[in-house]
Regions:
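N-terminal glycine-/serine-/threonine-rich beta1-alpha1-beta2 phosphate-ribose binding loop
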Residues: 1-110, 119-132
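Predominantly a Rossmann-like dinucleotide-binding segment in NAD(P)-dependent oxidoreductases
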Residues: 20, 24, 130-137, 141-229, ...
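C-terminal helical cap and adjacent loop that interface with cofactors, partners, or active-site loops
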Residues: 27, 197-203, 210, 234, ...
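Non-transmembrane alpha-helical segments in soluble domains
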Residues: 29, 55, 73-76, 98-102, ...
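Short strand-turn motif at the edge of the Rossmann-like AdoMet-binding core
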Residues: 43, 112-114, 138-141, 169, ...
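Short beta-strand segments
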Residues: 86, 166-167, 214-215, 248-251
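Short glycine/proline- and charge-enriched loop/turn segments
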Residues: 105, 179-185, 287-290
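Active-site rim elements
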Residues: 137-139, 185-192, 221-225, 251-254, ...
Length: 350
């Protein structure tokens, strides 16, 4: 039985396993190694070259040499000492790995999005609810100090009633060395795999899921690039929430230099705020107002993982828990369905 399921001092070491040590997983690994009171005891990946690099990274720290596996089920079966499991694998594998890790009693940090289908999301929520451990999703922007302060300001009535939300993610294409990402059946397409971060901030702001969505998108520039690509390179979607509230979101992957950027804006009766910078402007007044936000020594990924360890120790419900992560993932799926089917799609259809 994982030690965290027994009475334990907050100073006791938390033993960590990381499943998936590719691009995102290796970054999570570097950050979890910096969290006090943590020991990485096991690593798992199908790619032995990546596994060797991750093993060398861990071995050079106070954690010492970790055990390595290419089969996550074998790892979970053999290593009864694992307290928490970090999952950073392709999205279509999240459900089976997370449920298995929860069932053996570990707490789970699963990278976003939760899954590629609404059915798998629901199964993960059910598993998290019945688990002895804690489930936290990798929606790490909830731990970014500026975004967190901005949303607290909105919730306190700082910008008045929320009237409109606007976001966009306009960037260059992702590296073409990750084949699964460009297969929409494996990644969920980029509205689910990437845009879910921003959609999560907006659902956190509103506190409700949208009633319906409609949109349009396709592949206009990166045609068959990389070969076999099925993920969109551009789309736009509008969500309608209760109380006549709308969210406008667009996502482009072929922006030239100077046009790229990411925005998360909330407009209210008293003014508007940019979540990422914690900067707002009062209506009918000139000049920006920056909210007082202390500088963070670490980025949001570290802060999210550090919070996860604290939550696992205390058996406390995370800020980015299974229910909130499910809503944000399914908001992305609602937009995806509306885009694919070129019609208005209601929440109840998911």
């Amino acid at each position: 039985m994982p030690a965290l399921l027994q009475a334990q001092s907050p100073n006791d070491t938390v033993r960590v396993a990381v499943i998936g040590v590719g691009n995102r997983g290796s970054y999570d690994l570097k950050n979890i190694l910096k969290v006090p009171g943590v020991k990485v005891v096991a690593l798992c990946d199908l790619d032995t070259e990546r596994l060797d690099k991750a093993k060398a990274l861990v071995s050079a720290t106070a954690s010492g040499e970790p055990a390595t596996y290419t089969d996550f089920r074998k790892m979970l079966d053999e290593r009864k000492d694992i307290d928490v499991t970090i999952i950073a694998t392709p999205v279509d594998t999240h459900k089976m790995i997370a449920i298995d890790a929860l069932e053996v009693g570990t707490s789970v940090y699963c990278e976003k999005p939760m899954a590629t289908t609404p059915q798998d999301v629901r199964l993960m929520v059910a598993a998290a609810k019945s688990a002895k451990g804690v489930f936290q999703a990798g929606f790490q922007l909830r731990h970014d100090p500026r975004r967190r302060r901005s949303i607290e300001f909105i919730h306190s009535g700082g910008i008045g009633d929320v009237l409109f939300l606007q976001g966009y993610r306009h960037t260059g294409d992702l590296p073409h060395d990750t084949p699964w990402y460009f297969d929409r059946t494996r990644s969920g397409d980029n509205i689910v795999e990437q845009a879910c971060h921003i959609l999560d901030l907006f659902t956190w702001t509103v506190g409700k899921h949208p009633l319906r969505a409609f949109g349009s998108g396709g592949i206009n520039f990166f045609k068959n690039d990389p070969p076999g690509r099925t993920t969109m390179d551009n789309y736009a979607v509008i969500y309608e929430f209760p109380d006549d509230l709308r969210l406008e979101f667009s996502h482009i992957y072929f922006d030239p230099p100077g046009f790229s950027g990411v925005k998360e804006r909330v407009f209210g009766a008293k003014g508007a705020i940019d979540l990422a910078t914690a900067t707002w402007m009062e209506r009918d007044k000139k000049g920006e107002i920056k909210l007082d936000v202390p500088d963070a020594a670490e980025d949001s990924t570290y802060l999210s993982l550090a919070a996860f360890i604290d939550n696992a120790r205390a058996h406390k419900t995370p800020l980015n828990n299974a229910e909130s992560a499910a809503m944000s993932t399914m908001v992305a799926m609602l937009g995806r369905k509306a885009i694919y089917e070129k019609r208005v799609v209601r929440w109840e259809e998911l």
